[in-house]
């Protein structure tokens, strides 16, 4: 595991939301991060589809970590805008 991947994985594991939705960090490369989440009842809306808030939160998380992967060590990203 690279230092970059270790830094991002450590941050990922500290996020309670990601544990709650059962998200996993699949891959980390400079400028690209892949996150998977199983579809389950806990992330559904009233029609049985995955709630859009969960989708946008996972997208924001992946984009934030992809940006963080390009920054110097010790730099953090709060959100992707």
Located regions from the model:
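Terminal targeting signals and extreme-terminal segments of soluble enzymes
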Residues: 1-81
């Amino acid at each position: 595991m690279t230092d970059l991947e270790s830094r991002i994985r450590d941050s990922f594991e500290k996020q309670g939301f990601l544990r709650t939705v059962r998200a996993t960090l699949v891959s980390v490369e400079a400028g690209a991060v892949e996150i998977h989440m199983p579809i389950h009842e806990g992330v559904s809306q009233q029609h049985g589809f995955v709630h859009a808030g969960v989708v946008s939160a996972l997208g924001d998380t992946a984009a934030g970590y992809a940006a963080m992967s390009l920054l110097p060590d010790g730099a953090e990203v709060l959100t992707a805008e």
